A protein has these predicted regions:
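Hydrophobic helical membrane-anchoring modules
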Residues: 1-54, 218-305
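Donor nucleotide-sugar binding loop of glycosyltransferases
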Residues: 64-67, 89, 114
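Acceptor/aglycone-binding surface of glycosyltransferases and processive sugar-polymer synthases
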Residues: 109-112, 116-124, 129, 141-225, ...
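Acidic metal-phosphate-binding loop of nucleotide-sugar-dependent transferases
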Residues: 137-139
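Hydrophobic targeting segments
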Residues: 53-59, 68, 75, 81-85
Length: 305
């Protein structure tokens, strides 16, 4: 398994126009707040670069009617499809999504939990690339082009990282930051990888690699481990166990626009810990890998079988 990191500075030509002003490594200025009495202008979709492979965007959602229209409006132009996986929303989530983006594919997840919704959407994707995106507005859809660029550069699976230079977050509490750091250390030690971020839902991969991620069980109606917020860790572990080429790109996590997060730090943190230990035991090969190399700005190999 190969793991690479891709930084924004490594690209000779920018692949998209940033929505934030860079202040330094890991920090960005948030978008200016709306002015009272003046309606916010609708974002202009940034088209994907010519030659980008077809992309399916999978968005799991439950009770996100207020957030989804803004997320869908920010998606880049030229996408192959957008798949909304609804988790039995009690609000106007589906209707709001269809108003904001006519032609959106809507699936109803058979089970419960974010992991179940993501697995269903991933298995239904028909584009060459699948991107997973949260429905709360915390991820910047303009970064999709950077994920696609890392895939076309040779990666099989790309994780967004809030901790690489150029990434950051306005939503991380000290507790979440410390917990993520401890879990990343454990993951890297057990899997001989060099992830910098683990509990972040912005990912992309070649759709042909979905079979290696072993999602059929998680997509079923019956409750199983992996169907909750631990899904991001399960995906990373399955990619590592399958010896996929994994890359990281810097990503900025914004504040949720409306409502409260369904994430519970302690409960879901324990589930992530369990996922790391459980999926390591399921590794069919468990072959030792060399120690990761030191970081560099360019794409690089940091571990080998």
């Amino acid at each position: 398994m190969y793991t690479r990191r891709v930084s924004a500075a490594a690209a000779a030509t920018p692949m998209f126009t940033p929505h934030h002003t860079l202040l330094g490594p890991g920090t960005r200025a948030p978008a200016p707040p709306p002015v009272a009495g003046i309606p916010a202008a609708a974002p202009v979709p940034i088209p994907l670069p010519p030659g980008t492979p077809s992309i399916s965007v999978v968005i799991p959602a439950r009770d996100e009617a207020r957030n989804l229209p803004g997320v869908l409006a920010e998606l880049p132009g030229g996408l192959h499809e957008v798949i909304l996986v609804d988790g039995a929303s009690a609000d106007d989530t589906i209707a709001a999504a269809r108003r904001a983006r006519p032609g959106i594919r809507v699936l109803s997840q058979p089970g419960r939990g974010k992991g179940n919704a993501l697995a269903c959407g991933i298995l239904a994707a028909t584009g060459e690339i699948t991107v997973t995106l949260d429905a709360d507005g915390s991820a910047d859809p303009a970064e999709i082009a950077e994920f696609a660029a890392a895939l076309t550069a040779g990666a099989d699976f790309v994780k967004g990282s809030r901790y690489l230079p150029g990434g950051g977050s306005s939503d991380l509490t000290m507790l979440r930051r410390a917990g993520n750091g401890a879990l990343v250390l454990l993951m890297n030690r057990l899997y001989r990888t060099e992830f910098s971020d683990l509990c972040y839902g912005y990912n992309a991969f070649w759709t042909r690699c979905a079979a290696a991620l072993d999602l059929e069980r998680i997509a079923a109606a019956d409750p199983v481990f992996g169907d909750g917020f631990e899904i991001e860790t399960v995906l990373a572990a399955h990619a590592a166990n399958a010896r996929l080429t994994v890359a990281e790109v810097p990503s900025y996590e914004r504040d949720r626009r409306y409502g409260e997060s369904h994430l519970n730090t302690w409960r879901d943190g324990r589930r992530v810990l369990r996922a790391i230990l459980r999926e390591r035991r399921r590794d069919p090969a468990r072959t030792p890998r060399t120690r990761p190399a030191r970081p560099s700005a360019a794409p690089r190999t940091v571990s080998k079988p």
